Amino acid sequence: MDYLPIFCQLHDKPCLLVGGGEIAERKARLLLDAGAVITVNALDFNDQFRAWEKDAQLTLVHSTFDPALLNEVWLVIAATDNQDVNNHVYASASERRIFCNVVDSPERASFIMPSIIDRSPLMVAVSSGGTAPVLARLLREKLESILPQNLGKLAAFAGELRSRVKIRFCKMSARRRFWEKLFVHDRLAQALASEDRERVQQLTELLFSAPLDDRGEVTLVGAGPGDAGLLTLKGLQHLQQADIVVYDRLVSKEILNLSRRDAERIFVGKASGYHSVPQDQINQLLEEKARAGHRVVRLKGGDPFIFGRGAEELEYLQQAGVPFSVVPGITAASGCSAYSGIPLTHRDHSQGVRLITGHVKHDTDLDWSSLAAEKQTLVFYMGLQQAEHIQNKLIEQQLPETVPVAIIENGTSTKQRVLSGQLSQLGELAQQASSPSLIIIGNVVGLREKLSWFSDQTA
């Protein structure tokens, strides 16, 4: 992060603006909106500046720049068309440790001005750090079209209720639930927009009198196969509302960072052959945190109901009487195959898909004869350690040794690597791969050369 995003309270604080033209005028409008006490320094000023001075909204100083103008100033903006003057202003401000913005010169500025979406008191700022101002502007325009115009009224109304909410609800979790109900209350938003104060009062009293369930809850969320962009919108919504996030090894840092900054994160990572936290302790942890009134997101890689032991955890919560819900995720078979250019079904090559756990032992009672049937795709989860056993059992059942296979390592991520070969080479390929990996077996793998689109490391 090259710049720390902050919002400055400049009301009644002296600020200096150097420049008297159109660019300086735009900056002056922002400072006026912020309630700053503005001194503007230039040799000449446009009509708007003269009008502002006439209305006593700011003070004009007709002169060349003098560093003495910086005395007792909180903030300065250099907005002239003379680079030497701008540099002089910046150097003088830096000597005095005063924040200075030089318009269109981020490399010569101690702070930069973002693109702003103004829904006062709600403010949204977008910045590219000066590297791509057009992109920042386009994002601002996009956000302007999405954010309702009455958000400011809703935010201001929330400010009026803050002290009452603190008195009414002792627990932070109860307050958060109240605010979330208020902010998604469509009828209240409409009443505020139409300035129907009587209706606003009625709806507000209903919110305060409605019982708030103080119990916590657990939401089982599938994080998808790796790429943070594959997290569902509903999964993102629950993640950003969670007080506590209990997550596994396969959940990426990028997805974790989408949670609230004040949310507690608890790692219970598990991998084949190693369990850092036993399953019964995970179950008890979820119950304990929910009973304490927290909103808990149990975040699992892929889809929690496909080899994720999600059902086991929910069975425990159901018996314990803890409320729960489920947000499905994109399972590894779907995500990794798509990012590798391997369709799981194809009219000419595969009429079905089998998802199989790779945690198979030599005495496991799998129906290997049905797995060796033609025109289907086999997807083995967590199968690296048993790859040679899988290879041998399928060949025993007359599945041709030449059937294409692929091992997808770190699928959908920037570290994705795909190892391709034939069934007879599966055990050998597995020795070159590491977890997490997915094994795909079937003629559809042969389409990868034509359909591959995602940049990865191929072997």
UniProtKB/Swiss-Prot annotation:
Gene3D superfamilies: Cobalt-precorrin-4 Transmethylase, Domain 1, Methyltransferase, Cobalt-precorrin-4 Transmethylase, Domain 2, NAD(P)-binding Rossmann-like Domain, Sirohaem synthase, dimerisation domain, Siroheme synthase, domain 2. The keyword Cell wall biogenesis/degradation does not apply. Pathway: Cofactor biosynthesis; adenosylcobalamin biosynthesis; precorrin-2 from uroporphyrinogen III: step 1/1; Cofactor biosynthesis; adenosylcobalamin biosynthesis; sirohydrochlorin from precorrin-2: step 1/1; Porphyrin-containing compound metabolism; siroheme biosynthesis; precorrin-2 from uroporphyrinogen III: step 1/1; Porphyrin-containing compound metabolism; siroheme biosynthesis; siroheme from sirohydrochlorin: step 1/1. S-adenosyl-L-methionine binds at P225, G301, G302, D303, I306, T331, A332, M382, G411. Residues 1-204 are annotated as: Precorrin-2 dehydrogenase /sirohydrochlorin ferrochelatase. The modification Phosphoserine is found at S128. Residues 216-459 are annotated as: Uroporphyrinogen-III C-methyltransferase. Disulfide bonds: none annotated. PANTHER family: SIROHEME SYNTHASE, SIROHEME SYNTHASE-RELATED. HAMAP family: Siroheme_synth. Then it catalyzes the NAD-dependent ring dehydrogenation of precorrin-2 to yield sirohydrochlorin. Finally, it catalyzes the ferrochelation of sirohydrochlorin to yield siroheme. This is Siroheme synthase 2. The gene is cysG2.
